[in-house]
């Protein structure tokens, strides 16, 4: 449950990180079930707080940004994502919204294959391009690799321009064989068939793709000029062109028939040749589809009825406390080994101690564990009926398991605030050098990783002791690059006070709070909890975090301040914000722009703007790209100033 705007923003950042790993790195950090749960909580918060919706929320976009390994290619028609439903009541509500307006509507149901979406463009009967989904508007051009997928026709008996879309998958049998080969070759194993399919499709060497035995299962079309009446007719036409037929495809008239087909699929799931994670439901009548239309992210005429995640019962025999990059302590349960979906599970995350307490999970409990193709399984609940008196309460740790410093215990999370804790040093330094902190050019996460590996740095102070010969030891560092980095590090001295405060990475203290603190002078961090509470916008958690952080890191902070000699203000930056035409203005971005909306949103926020996702009478500017839609009409109704992309760029250039 998301309770505050801060938690909401953190959830967006976390889900976007998961999406990046899932879509671009072929790495499922969490299970689909865990992601879905976190995503639904985000949607629920946005439903109650529509004016707070952020442009970079995963509810507002499809997939993830396209990586740089392959050339980008636009889709002729957008590739949409599907909304999920998880139970009978949610499905009933979705169906009722459609059947109330269109009582005669019917529904095509088909297995939801867990693979990689691919868009095939045919012109004059020839396959000319194959593009991954990407962000829905553009994806990676993988034509050479797609032509090595055996069941993708290189030519079809239709000369018009048509986009045929489907899922690239690897069968369970071929996945197992592939992982055995990789094991024998001492290569990293794929976590699941979806990751294997994605990694195989995106190989730079097409011969590797050819060996992976990928398959393409069609599920729809994009741009075309054919006059289909129904979705089923469209799918039949695709099969007639030589594509593989969809197994267990059915046409249904009501909720009961859909539920029957859903449960049939669940029964067939284990024996199905490929990995399934649900059932796709699509309105069959194309005229009804057109009238229902789309949300910002997904069609209103289709949904994915998700399967329950695979689960098993086992026993918790121990607890390991792991320290994350932010200092957050994550309890991990040590389990009696249990096999789930072909993998032996010995550990499962418990997320945080608040969740342990809420679920009343105890040491030696028998518990329900789920795993849906992910690496780290999740404990759902304890089986209290199995308790025999040997169970013990799982206590929150009081000191860090790595550095033994006293922990900051909040209602939900527990943190190690020691900046010198080895488990969080690397991430602390990445934040220290970031754009909103000391903005040290050239000091990214890969460089910091190398510096740690070479034992050249252990904390921020060590950065300023680096020498040219130290940096020359790093991979790909020549004299010029090394000297540029040394110059950038030295240039970061004498920063505005707020930047140095923000660079410390104090829990609950971001850019805005750092600017407020900076107004109180160089000794601001020495103040008491009561004094912090008197500051505008500061609550108990922020005040306690500041007090505890300073108590744990006094010597380090003083040394850092002495070395960097921060300025008490930064009038240049403040003047730029306050003089900006966008300062304190509410801005909405809509339509297709040449750059990602989030990139423009960041530029505008740096000039003091507030970014919103919905137009109202309180909106000051609407930035419009192509296909602006209803927001443009609403802006005109409310008398909102409208800027196109060219006008926006002209105004932004004034502040370069």
UniProtKB/Swiss-Prot annotation:
Residues 577-656 form the BRCT domain. Keywords: DNA damage, DNA repair, DNA replication, Ligase, Magnesium, Manganese, Metal-binding, NAD, Zinc. It comes from the Bacteria. GO terms for cellular component: cytosol. Pfam families: BRCT (PF00533), DNA_ligase_aden (PF01653), DNA_ligase_OB (PF03120). Its cofactor is Mg(2+); Mn(2+). Its EC number is 6.5.1.2. GO terms for biological process: DNA repair; DNA replication. CDD domains: BRCT_DNA_ligase_like (cd17748), LIGANc (cd00114). One of its GO terms (molecular function) is DNA binding. NAD(+) binds at residues 32-36, 81-82, 133, 167, 306. It catalyses: NAD(+) + (deoxyribonucleotide)n-3'-hydroxyl + 5'-phospho-(deoxyribonucleotide)m = (deoxyribonucleotide)n+m + AMP + beta-nicotinamide D-nucleotide. It is an enzyme of class 6 (ligase). The active site is at 112 (n6-amp-lysine intermediate). Zn(2+) binds at residues 400, 403, 416, 421. Belongs to the NAD-dependent DNA ligase family. LigA subfamily. This is DNA ligase. It comes from Helicobacter pylori (strain Shi470). The lineage of its organism: Bacteria, Pseudomonadati, Campylobacterota, Epsilonproteobacteria, Campylobacterales.
